[in-house]
A protein has these predicted regions:
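S-adenosyl-L-methionine-dependent methyltransferase catalytic module, highlighting the catalytic core
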Residues: 111-116, 123-210
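Class I SAM-dependent methyltransferase SAM/SAH-binding core
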Residues: 49-86
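A short SAM/SAH-binding and catalytic strip from SAM-dependent methyltransferases
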Residues: 97-108
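Conserved beta-strand/loop positions that form the S-adenosyl-L-methionine
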Residues: 39
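Conserved SAM/SAH-binding loop
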Residues: 43
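Class I SAM-dependent methyltransferase Rossmann-like catalytic core
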Residues: 4-18
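Conserved alpha-helix/loop element of class I SAM-dependent methyltransferases that forms part
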Residues: 17-33
Length: 210
């Protein structure tokens, strides 16, 4: 699965992988045969796809015991763990890619998690919903309440999201940490966003390294 070269309504069109456009981007980035660790991997769907279609050595970490069992049933190597506690079980530079897809905003210590990703991996792929999207801003402006949008569908009291970041926030963090941003992708639905991504992108995907 790669980014399609076609245009829809004049905008570059991004395909889907397992129902998600950010997975399509991740599926494009990861090189065949790579060693991959997916943090917060859920039931292992992405790892299963990468193993079958890219021939990767796929490993995962997931906090939910039920999801770990379902991932193992898929034939994916996943262990139960809390990524906020670090990745002490893995040596330095053990993986080619460490993936964190729409989970960063749910971690208690996002900076520690990012640093651990780049300790155990040569590159990190980080995807997150953009809290700076215009619909989020408009919702807060017009209602004066915590926003509920397609990407942030939860009420404030039951949301798994505890750190709300924007595209510009992550760019600033990368500079602060001295990270090299190798690739950036900005998505709105299935369209790639070019101009004003902090305002127009619903989801961002970054490929970074030390």
């Amino acid at each position: 699965m790669t980014m399609a070269a076609s245009e829809q309504h004049g905008k570059p069109f991004v395909g889907e992988l397992l129902g998600r456009s950010d997975y399509a981007i991740i599926g494009e980035i990861v090189e065949p045969g790579a060693k991959v660790l997916d943090l917060g991997c859920g039931e292992g769907e992405l790892l299963e796809w990468l193993a079958e279609n890219k021939g990767v050595d796929a490993r995962g970490v997931e906090i939910s015991g039920a999801r770990v069992q379902r991932a193992i049933a898929r034939g994916v190597s996943v262990y139960q763990g809390d990524i906020d506690q670090g990745l002490a079980d893995y040596p330095d530079q053990a993986f080619d890619y460490v993936i964190l897809s729409q989970t960063l905003q749910e971690t208690r210590q996002p900076l520690r998690v990012l640093r651990e990703m780049l300790r155990v991996g040569r590159r990190a792929i980080v995807a997150f919903p953009n809290f700076g999207h215009w619909r989020v801003r408009l919702s807060m402006l017009t209602t004066g309440r915590a926003p509920k949008t397609r990407l942030f569908p939860y009420d404030w009291y039951d949301s798994p999201n505890i750190h709300f970041l924007t595209v510009d926030d992550f760019e600033q963090l990368a500079r602060m940490e001295g990270l090299a941003v190798e690739r950036r992708f900005f998505l709105a639905g299935h369209s790639a966003v070019g101009m004003l991504p902090n305002l127009r992108a619903e989801v961002a995907v970054f490929l970074v390294r030390r």
